[in-house]
Amino acid sequence: MSIIVALDAKSQYDALKIVEQLDPTLCRVKVGKELFTHEGPSVVKKLQEENFEVFLDLKFHDIPNTTAQAVCAAADLGVWMVNVHASGGRKMIETCVERLKAGNYQTQLIAVTVLTSMGREDLKDIGLDIEPVEQVKRLAKLTKESGLDGVVCSAQEAKILRELIGQDFSLVTPGIRPEGSNADDQKRIVTPKQAMLDGSTHLVIGRPITKAENPTEMLKSILASIA
């Protein structure tokens, strides 16, 4: 079990101010679209200089060759983990796996199933008249069959996916909120302890840590709750 701190920052300066208060031996960090678009690869390199392993959360989704090139570009940066959208299809994600293997990269590749902000009505709006958990199961199975390292899923789906896919597969879980935290824009949320019990391997936690008065103490408190 590991914690990935989502760096909810617009600038490299703000991101580095957050990680100044964190211990790289206790967590990894996630760089998302907003921060990466503002700062580019330099923010990844700066975080690595501070000894943090980086999950580059850009959710690539394009034609197979373009997506694979982007994934390999991320691997060239030395990131620990990168992700793609499983809904891009088998050919797209398998091409990414093949290119990473051909380049002898060690970067972990995972896939996004259904965004944690999406409910049944949201899926219906895009032509999928199905419960989110059923679509998650479909895409997780496709991801496993295609040779990826894991999926992003809500903790409420983790137990189901463990039974469906088995143990040798990472379940990276956003929507984690310690007891008493605001749900913000996440619809499918759960506590760190429950996520661990349900089979999640990596917990993505942002605002409860980054907006805390003392991020380090909050991180330690969360770690203690799942010890």
From Swiss-Prot:
GO terms for cellular component: cytosol. SUPFAM superfamilies: Ribulose-phoshate binding barrel. Pathway: Pyrimidine metabolism; UMP biosynthesis via de novo pathway; UMP from orotate: step 2/2. Its EC number is 4.1.1.23. GO terms for molecular function: orotidine-5'-phosphate decarboxylase activity. It is an enzyme of class 4 (lyase). Belongs to the OMP decarboxylase family. Type 1 subfamily. Homodimer. Gene3D superfamilies: Aldolase class I. The keyword Lyase applies. Coiled coil: none annotated. PANTHER family: OROTIDINE 5'-PHOSPHATE DECARBOXYLASE. Substrate binds at residues 8, 30, 57-66, 116, 177, 186, 206-207. The keyword Lyase applies. The active site is at 59 (proton donor). This is Orotidine 5'-phosphate decarboxylase. InterPro entries: Aldolase_TIM, OMPdecase, OMPdecase_AS, OMPdecase_bac, OMPdeCOase_dom, RibuloseP-bd_barrel. Catalyzes the decarboxylation of orotidine 5'-monophosphate (OMP) to uridine 5'-monophosphate (UMP). GO terms for biological process: 'de novo' pyrimidine nucleobase biosynthetic process; 'de novo' UMP biosynthetic process. It catalyses: orotidine 5'-phosphate + H(+) = UMP + CO2.
